[in-house]
Structure formats: structure tokens, C-alpha cells
């Protein structure tokens, strides 16, 4: 019986056996190669660390204009807060931080003792008493006929003309289109138009300004308009209050002891609009910073002729200024070491001033990105109240710098403007609701933090 060949022949069997014997000899070599891997990993990590260290030194010390600008923004944004200065001091070398702060000091010194003034008498902000005309031999019958021939259409034409004269910023084509789509807005005539789509759940109107801004609200009777302002990394609202005589600083009911929400202050003083005004000493009874109740005014303020608080003392890091509203209903800006004017009726202190007598005090060192509140006055004597949202990081809304605020206000012909307390306190309330989101997630939709006072634009007295 023939035998079965398992390996073909003896040579092939020998080769297979040889390979099997050779395999164990290769195993020690493989083990030696594995011992070399930790060295490679270590080398990779060292390379990564060296690259990161090189990047760190590049970001800290390079004079590249793009990197330097954002480094300055980062440092100033962190150092302008109470709670987050560690983001600069812990991560960046002290000399780098000091250099940025020194440049800020130089920028403040450049403003110097500039003090605002008005070069001409303002137009009267309230209707003058009618002047009795000289008696002339005229046909009174004809005069009566002219009055009687004024039709309702003629009256509305005059009211429409007055409306567009007051709200000169409006793009008339978009306003007319809105009225055509929403004819009910004219139910009470042009003089009583009241459009409000400024709420946090609203999307605004289709009306635009000639500056390209979306209109959120118009109230002809109250002489006020709200427009959306937005740009790279920020959004907010500019309120244009046409009658400066109706804007005052109003206090919380517990000023000196506790603050109130902006809207609460407005409602207590018959206001239709309110924004943040003075800063406050943000410390609680246990001495914990960042937990104040908003009652203690930081700096000096005046409300309806009565002064409160203690004047700021300027230092090299912060040059403080006072914004005064005088009895002529005009804004004046001066350094805090100047005497309060005798005819001042309302005031607040903060920094920096951003427009004095039409000159924009723009520079490269007031560039921190924060929620903002600014107040200004146009060459038509309108009060301009600007609030910018910020620190909404998931939406890419960081806030903006005072230079951008100056550009927004300048579009509306501001000749005076100053930055006031913003940050987590930045808020605007209009006609019964908050129209700005706060930067604190816990109070984002409910009015943010209690404050000692607010700029309040009062309703027309019936």
C-alpha cells in the first residue's frame, strides 16, 4: 500500500521545518524593537512641548500687528473685570501686562483736561409760547374759510410731514411699505404711531434707517425710536430719545442700601425707557467682591438736583470723568476733579469719554471687548442711549470696544458721548419689557443685576 505524502517531498518538508525553527530566533529581535517605542513617544512629546513653548513666547512677545492687537484686547478685557483678571495674570508674563496697561495710561493722559462745551445756543427743546401777530386789516371771513377748508386728509398730510421731520433717520420707502402691510398702525394717525417689535422674542420690523439699521420700535407720541446695531462679535440697541428734557438719572428706592432692577426703577418713575447708569461698589456685607446688592454708588451721581456718593479719584490707571446734564438739557463732560456745575440737574461718573465737541477720542488702547452702555447727544440735541450685549460666548457675541461705540454714535451725529457702567450690569428696558440680554446666564432674561440708579426717559405727561 503506497504511503501518503504530507509535504510533497523531503526538501519542502525541510524548508518548512527550517522556517519553524527560525521563528523563535526572531522573537528576541521583536522585543528589542518594542523597547525603542517609548523613546520615540518621548521624543514626539518633547517636540510638541517645545513647539507649544515657542508658540507661547511668540504670542507673548511678537510685534506682529495682528497678534499684538488681539493680545492687547485679551489683556485689557481680562484686567477690566473684577473676577477674571487671573486670565491675564496667570497666563501672561507681568512685563507684557504692564506694557499694555502703561499704553492705556498714556492714552488716558492724551485726553488730558478736555472739557466739553456748546458753541452756540441750543434750539429750544419745548414749544415756545405763540407770538401774538400784529393786527392787520385782513378779511376775517377769508381766514375762517381757509381754516374750514382743512380736510382730515390735509391734517394727516401735515402730521405725516412732522413725523418724518422728527424721525429724520427713517428710510421712507421701507416705512411706507410697512404701513401698507400693516395699515392698522395709522388707526390713530401719524402723530400717534406706536410700533413695538423690540422684545426678546420679537424679530424687529422691516423698517430700516438710512444708516442701514433695523428699526425695532417707534413711538411718535413719546418721541422715541429703537434701532438694532450689530457687527463683528456684538449686537445691541440704540435708543434715540428726541426730547432731552425728559431724560433724568433716577435712583432705586433703596439707594445707599440696596439696588433695584433697571425696569423697576423706570416703572417707579413713570418711564418708558431706561438703561444702566452709575457703577456700584460690588461687595457684600461679608466682604466678598462680586456679590454686591447694587445699593452703593461708585463715584458721584446727581438725580434731579440732589447729589449722591463720593467723587472718584483719578489715578494713572483710570482717569475718571463726569457726565453732567444741565438745566438747558444739554450734556457736558469734564474730569471728576472739576467742580460740579451750579446748573447741573443730573450726573454720573465713569470713563472713558469717547466724543467731546464732535471729536472722537479714538485710540488703540481702549479695546477690551465687553458689554457696553454709552450715553451721548446729537447735534439735534437728541439723547442717544446705546447698550451692547456681550459675553454670550456660545453665540459668538463677545461685546465690543468703546471705539466701535463711537462709530455707532457718530452715525447719528453725536457731538458728546461717554462710556458708563456696563459689564454684567448692562441693560435696557423699554415699554414694560427688557430688550437686552444680560451677560450673566442666571439673570439673562430677567433684567440682569440690581443697580443704584438708571437713566430714565419719562413718558409724556397727560
Where are these regions (language model features)?
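Gly/Ser/Thr/Pro-rich low-complexity, intrinsically disordered segments
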Residues: 2-462
Amino acid at each position: 500500500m503506497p504511503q501518503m505524502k504530507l509535504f510533497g517531498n523531503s526538501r519542502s518538508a525541510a524548508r518548512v521545518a527550517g522556517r519553524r525553527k527560525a521563528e523563535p530566533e526572531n522573537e528576541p529581535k521583536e522585543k528589542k524593537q518594542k523597547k525603542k517605542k517609548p523613546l520615540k513617544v518621548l521624543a514626539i512629546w518633547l517636540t510638541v512641548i517645545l513647539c507649544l513653548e515657542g508658540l507661547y513666547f511668540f504670542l507673548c512677545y511678537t510685534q506682529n500687528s495682528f497678534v499684538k492687537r488681539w493680545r492687547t484686547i485679551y489683556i485689557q478685557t481680562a484686567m477690566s473685570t473684577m473676577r477674571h483678571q487671573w486670565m491675564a495674570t496667570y497666563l501672561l508674563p507681568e512685563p507684557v501686562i504692564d506694557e499694555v496697561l502703561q499704553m492705556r495710561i498714556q492714552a488716558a493722559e492724551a485726553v488730558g483736561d478736555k472739557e466739553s462745551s456748546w458753541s452756540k445756543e441750543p434750539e429750544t427743546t419745548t414749544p415756545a409760547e405763540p407770538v401774538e401777530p400784529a393786527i392787520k386789516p385782513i378779511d376775517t371771513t377769508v381766514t375762517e374759510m381757509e381754516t374750514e377748508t382743512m380736510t382730515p386728509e390735509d391734517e394727516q398730510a401735515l402730521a405725516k410731514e412732522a413725523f418724518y421731520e422728527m424721525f429724520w433717520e427713517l428710510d421712507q420707502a421701507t416705512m411706507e411699505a410697512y404701513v401698507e402691510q400693516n395699515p392698522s398702525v395709522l388707526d390713530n394717525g401719524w402723530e400717534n404711531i406706536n410700533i413695538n417689535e423690540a422684545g426678546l422674542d420679537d424679530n424687529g420690523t422691516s423698517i430700516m434707517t438710512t444708516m442701514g439699521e433695523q428699526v425695532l420700535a417707534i413711538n411718535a407720541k413719546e418721541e422715541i425710536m429703537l434701532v438694532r446695531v450689530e457687527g463683528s462679535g456684538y449686537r445691541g440697541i440704540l435708543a434715540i430719545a428726541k426730547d432731552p428734557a425728559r431724560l433724568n438719572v433716577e435712583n432705586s428706592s433703596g439707594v445707599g442700601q440696596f439696588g433695584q432692577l433697571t425696569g423697576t426703577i423706570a416703572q417707579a418713575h413713570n418711564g418708558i425707557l431706561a438703561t444702566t447708569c452709575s457703577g456700584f461698589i460690588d461687595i457684600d456685607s461679608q466682604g466678598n467682591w462680586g456679590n454686591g446688592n447694587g445699593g452703593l454708588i461708585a463715584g458721584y451721581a446727581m438725580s434731579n438736583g440732589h447729589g449722591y456718593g463720593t467723587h472718584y479719584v483719578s489715578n494713572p490707571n483710570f482717569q475718571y470723568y463726569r457726565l453732567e446734564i444741565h438745566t438747558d438739557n444739554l450734556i457736558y463732560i469734564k474730569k471728576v476733579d472739576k467742580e460740579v456745575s451750579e446748573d447741573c440737574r443730573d450726573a454720573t461718573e465713569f470713563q472713558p469719554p469717547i466724543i467731546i465737541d464732535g471729536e472722537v477720542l479714538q485710540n488703540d488702547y481702549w479695546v477690551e471687548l465687553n458689554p457696553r452702555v454709552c450715553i451721548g447727544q446729537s447735534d439735534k440735541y437728541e439723547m442717544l442711549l446705546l447698550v451692547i450685549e456681550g459675553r454670550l460666548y456660545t453665540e459668538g457675541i463677545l461685546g465690543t470696544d468703546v471705539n466701535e461705540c463711537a462709530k455707532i454714535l457718530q452715525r447719528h451725529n453725536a457731538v458728546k458721548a461717554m462710556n458708563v457702567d456696563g459689564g454684567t450690569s448692562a441693560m435696557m428696558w423699554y415699554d414694560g419689557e427688557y430688550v437686552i440680554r444680560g451677560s450673566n446666564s442666571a439673570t439673562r432674561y430677567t433684567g440682569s443685576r440690581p443697580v443704584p440708579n438708571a437713566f430714565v426717559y419719562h413718558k409724556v405727561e397727560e
